[in-house]
Regions:
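Structured alpha/beta reader/binder surfaces that contact nucleic acids or chromatin modification marks
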Residues: 1-130
Length: 130
């Protein structure tokens, strides 16, 4: 299963159910399949979800969906950041109960392919060699 890398601030909102739209600069073909939610910079697997649908986000969508994307930028600022912004509709979000880690490959920014989560004890054995 592939993993989507998300900054902690946004991931916390997604896992709490407050944020249901992930805003990205392009579409994705990974719709309808389970994915891992990976916390950027921590090598942690924090949850799973399905990307239910994807659509280019217009100015009116941006305003109407503010409660769902939770991003405090104007549409003009969004367009400065992303030339072609898309809303990824997240569904079936499930936080991971245990502490899971993953091996973060060099250069991975948006996706990590074929994530193999390991629990906290396995991580310690790997890091400390016991």
């Amino acid at each position: 299963m592939d993993g989507l890398i998300i900054k902690k601030k946004w991931l916390d909102l997604i896992l709490s159910g407050k944020k249901t739209l992930e805003i990205r600069g392009c579409s994705t073909k990974k719709m309808g399949v389970p994915i891992y939610l990976l916390e950027s910079g921590s090598k942690r697997v924090r949850g799973t979800c399905i990307i239910q649908s994807v659509y280019p986000i217009s100015c009116s969508d941006w305003s109407e969906e503010q409660e769902n994307h939770c991003v405090d930028l104007s549409y003009k600022e969004l367009k400065e950041r992303y030339k072609n912004p898309h809303a990824w509709v997240l569904a079936d979000v499930k936080p991971v109960e245990d502490v899971w880690y993953y091996d973060h490959p060099n250069g991975a920014v948006i996706w990590v392919k074929d994530v193999s989560p390991i629990d906290e004890m396995q991580d310690e054995r790997i890091r400390y060699g016991y």
